[in-house]
Design a protein with these regions (language model features):
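Zn-dependent metallopeptidase/amidohydrolase metal-coordination segment
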Residues: 40, 157, 326-336, 419-421, ...
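Acidic, glycine-rich active-site loops and adjacent beta-strand->loop/helix elements
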Residues: 133-135, 199-214, 221, 230-235, ...
């Protein structure tokens, strides 16, 4: 069994224990502890859903449209004002220990770099909780992403309540939990000197999905001595590197005869998000051929033999627009760009399904070759339906002692766009240690120095394609968005988190090596931990996907664990 499979099994097991621990945790502790825990429990029960729901109604996703930035900033300001109002209301009942708001902001090249939040205490040692209030785009609006509601979903074999809406799980729900924990801490230590020498800080990132404002903030004010990034799973010991290549082919002149792929476009969205739909438009001067294709293409699609006979193809819809044939495929399953393997195993990618099928129709001359067809041929040749780079393992496939086989470098082909000039493919790559230019020494914690080996690997790849399949050249430009980050699970900070987890849950803390990028990357004092207990990002959670939902019981237990971590940090505030 691969490391990833083991982690999925262990995290689900711990999730079951987590739900069972709810009653245990609520009833444990001294009489003073009971009073403070009752505040935490009461606030979780009465305010988590309503406060998160308010944030979910505010659209805070960025798009490629330059006009989206102002809308996002305006709604983030509304989010800030709402949270500040909650803090002010809470502070009225406090005598000495109050939530003190802070804000850091500056203009960036394309986006506002902005962090805000609350502090308890003012000591030189700083302990932090991080969450973010921006989200990825909602995709198809039919699922009512900004109309939060609670519904029962089957989760680990039983019906559980889920809060549904964009950001409920990533990361507005966790952000509200963090604020509830801060209020519980202030309630517990009001009128005491327990926080002397210590500052507990809650930071809300406003651009985690795109630009990581916290990184700029830390450059200016310094990194906390210890912090929990509440935006992942329990508990991240390594994050893969992130690479973002763009492959392009010139569109060229339309074929003068026959029918051809006029455009191939994924639905608007982020590169780290498998799109909910992909649409291909087929046109040409042979109307009889277009009619035949419209009549037969659904059967051809069902009969087409993908490179894996067990491959699950995305649902296809066929329509007409004037004489053109329009093909639309729809996503099934996980949509987070860091887990294309989960989508491949349990769902279907609309990009991969339609690209491979149409490349075949170009190969067999049903469709005339052009720039779009050339790009789809490159996609089918380079990756087919695979996600680990198996078609060109010498260049694309890597796994290692941290990111083991089954959890190595992944390729999510997420964005294909056709313009009047060219067709472009964007890939979300989460890469293992072997794709980095500087080897890990096996012991040093943190982000690896240097950059990836992908520029050379991709140059070899496109040259190999040109040799194997001569035709219009594919060009590539790539950006190394982040290098891998590896931690020591035996370090004191991990052991402190583990101790709090075990006291709250009654079971050992799991460890995960993930593809997702968090605010902890590059900051060795920060650990990405919680709020989820599973690496399964597809249904019913649907991380970055349609019908995103937060398992309420799991998230509330995560708040209890986070609270225990903070209690321990305050009790041992001289510990580094």
């Amino acid at each position: 069994m691969s490391m990833l499979s083991c982690m999925k099994r262990d995290l689900v097991h711990h999730g079951r224990l987590a739900v069972a621990a709810l009653v245990f945790f609520a009833g444990c502790g001294s009489s003073d502890g009971d009073d403070t825990r009752s505040y935490l429990e009461r606030t979780l029960a009465q305010q988590f859903v309503s406060e998160t729901s308010h944030l979910v109604t505010l659209q805070t996703y960025r798009t490629e449209d330059p006009q989206s930035e102002q809308l996002v900033v305006d709604n983030l300001a509304r989010s800030r004002d709402y949270l500040m109002g909650l803090a002010q209301e809470f502070n009225r009942g406090q005598s000495t220990l109050k939530l003190e708001p802070f804000e850091w902001r500056r203009a960036g090249p394309t986006q506002t770099q902005w962090v805000f939040g609350f502090r308890l205490g003012s000591g030189p040692k700083k302990v932090a909780i991080l969450a973010h209030l921006d989200t990825v785009p909602p995709g198809n609006a039919d699922w009512r992403p900004f109309e939060p509601r609670v519904e029962a979903r089957d989760y680990r074999g039983a019906a559980q309540p889920f809060l549904v809406g964009r950001g409920a799980a990533d990361d507005k729900g966790p952000a509200v939990l963090a604020l509830i924990v801060m209020r519980a801490l202030a309630n517990r230590y009001d009128g005491t000197n327990a926080l002397d020498g210590l500052t507990v800080e809650l930071l809300f990132d406003t651009s985690e999905e795109t630009d990581f404002s916290t990184a700029y903030y830390f450059q200016e004010v310094g990194v906390p001595d210890f912090g929990i990034v509440f935006d992942a799973v329990w508990t991240v010991r390594a994050e893969k590197g992130i690479e973002r290549p763009i492959f392009t082919v010139p569109l060229g002149a339309a074929p003068s005869n026959g029918i051809f792929i006029e455009a191939f476009n994924s639905a608007p969205g982020a590169t780290n998000q498998i799109p909910d739909t992909v649409t291909a438009r087929i046109n040409g001067n042979d109307e009889a051929a277009l009619d035949r294709l419209a009549a037969n293409v659904a059967d051809l699609y069902q009969q087409y033999g993908f490179d894996d006979p067990l491959y699950r193809r995305a649902p296809l819809e066929v329509s007409r627009d004037a004489k053109a044939v329009v093909l639309t495929t729809k996503v099934i399953g996980a949509q987070h760009g860091s887990v294309p393997d989960e989508n491949r195993a349990n769902g279907a990618s609309p990009v991969v399904s339609l690209a491979n099928f149409l490349a075949h129709l170009v190969d067999d001359a049903t469709l005339a070759p052009n720039g779009v067809g050339r790009m789809l041929q490159f996609m089918a040749w380079g990756w087919g339906t695979t996600v680990f780079g198996e078609k060109h393992p010498d260049l694309l496939e890597r796994h290692d002692q941290v990111f083991e086989q089954g959890n190595g470098t992944t390729y999510a082909l997420t964005r294909v766009t056709t313009s009047p000039q060219d067709v472009a493919l964007r890939i979300d790559i989460r890469y293992a240690l072997g794709h980095h230019g500087v080897a890990w020494d096996g012991k040093t914690e943190g982000q690896l120095p240097g950059t990836s080996v992908f520029p050379d690997a991709f140059e070899q790849l496109v040259n190999r394609f040109q040799q194997d399949r001569p035709g219009q050249a594919v060009t590539v430009a790539t950006v190394n968005a982040a290098s891998p980050d590896v931690r020591d699970p035996q370090s004191p900070r991990f052991q402190r988190i583990s101790g709090a987890y075990e006291r709250a849950v009654g079971a050992p803390m799991p460890l995960a090596a993930i593809g997702g990028g968090t605010d902890a990357k590059g900051q060795v004092n920060l650990v990405a931990a919680g709020p989820l207990f599973t690496l399964a990002f597809g249904p019913p959670i649907n991380y970055h996907g349609l019908n995103e939902g937060a398992p309420i019981e799991d998230l509330q237990l995560s708040a209890r664990i986070l609270y225990q971590i903070m209690l321990d940090e305050i009790a041992n505030k001289t510990t580094r």
